[in-house]
Amino acid sequence: MRTLWIVAVCLIGVEGNLFQFGEMILEKTGKEVVHSYAIYGCYCGWGGQGRAQDATDRCCFVHDCCYGTVNDCNPKTATYSYSFENGDIVCGDNDLCLRTVCECDRAAAICLGQNVNTYDKNYEYYSISHCTEESEQC
């Protein structure tokens, strides 16, 4: 099921939110999202369960929690406005739902960038079957 996330990124194209999130991640980490974050640990990618495996995976856990607070739009498909200004990601929507989605993505991209030096290749393509410990609450 988590591999569906890769397909979703490819199918959504330039208008979809997952593409926008991927651009933010690339800007902050220098890593392509499909190869580095689409299936990483227990939370990066589609769905999530168990305990986050490291700081990178925790960024994805917090991002999932943030998406859980979004009402009135689908955070995985909502298209918002944002820009890169002097290395910062700036969300520009007045619509509360779209702005919230953008801020969730912005915070996660910044978190991933702050933890890029501890990125562990052992968690790339990590099997969800290893994610059996009880999850913390959002």
Curated annotation (Swiss-Prot):
Example GO biological process: arachidonate secretion
Transmembrane residue ranges: none
Keywords: Calcium, Disulfide bond, Hydrolase, Lipid degradation, Lipid metabolism, Metal-binding, Neurotoxin, Phospholipase A2 inhibitor, Presynaptic neurotoxin, Secreted, Signal, Toxin
Superkingdom, taxonomy of origin: Eukaryota
Cofactor requirement: Ca(2+)
Disulfide bond positions: C42-C131, C44-C60, C59-C111, C65-C138, C66-C104, C73-C97, C91-C102
Alphabetized Pfam families for the sequence: Phospholip_A2_1
Residues given in the record as Ca(2+) binding sites: Y43, G45, G47, D64
InterPro entries: PLipase_A2, PLipase_A2_Asp_AS, PLipase_A2_dom, PLipase_A2_dom_sf, PLipase_A2_His_AS
GO cellular component: extracellular region
Role played: Heterodimer: RV-4/RV-7 targets the presynaptic sites of the neuromuscular junction. Monomer: snake venom phospholipase A2 (PLA2) RV-7 that has low enzymatic activity and is not toxic. It inhibits the enzymatic activity of RV-4 in vitro but potentiates its lethal potency and neurotoxicity. It may facilitate the specific binding of RV-4 to its presynaptic binding sites, probably by acting as a chaperone, minimizing distraction and destruction of RV-4 en route to the site of action by reducing non-specific binding to muscle and other organs. PLA2 catalyzes the calcium-dependent hydrolysis of the 2-acyl groups in 3-sn-phosphoglycerides.
Protein name: Acidic phospholipase A2 RV-7
